[in-house]
């Protein structure tokens, strides 16, 4: 039974981490190197993350500077950033790529908050599915005589506690991101 509980906790933690990674790519009106986290560059035929091909600096609150390690990859990186539809317009001077992060309009902020809530809801659904799987495993163990009926009840209560904690954590992560987006 403790195996089921530890796996439940681990899977729910992964769902929360996945949500955090997904939220990190959302532009909240400030430059952040995570903005380019999902951008893959076609580098010698292989899709390669920008972070492996260039250093990404934030010299000003709304400016990203991408300095390729290999200057020949500059145009490929610029093309990949354009293709990623991040709502930014990269400009190159032959040495580095500068990306001005535009200020968000109120309408765009509300749109982003809606997207964030949708991502959060997906994470909660994932957590509830994990709860269902864990409860099914516990019921199967009880049917097979591995655990008693009392242990089943205790186990399902523990799974519910882990679920509640995980959903609270998701709510906290969402609240922080919404506050970040709505702050001007």
From Swiss-Prot:
Responsible for the release of ribosomes from messenger RNA at the termination of protein biosynthesis. May increase the efficiency of translation by recycling ribosomes from one round of translation to another. InterPro entries: Ribosome_recyc_fac (IPR002661), Ribosome_recyc_fac_dom (IPR023584), RRF_sf (IPR036191). Keywords: Cytoplasm, Protein biosynthesis. This is Ribosome-recycling factor. It is found in: Cytoplasm. Pfam families: RRF. GO terms for molecular function: ribosomal large subunit binding. One of its GO terms (cellular component) is cytoplasm. GO terms for biological process: translational termination. Belongs to the RRF family. It comes from the Bacteria. SUPFAM superfamilies: Ribosome recycling factor, RRF.
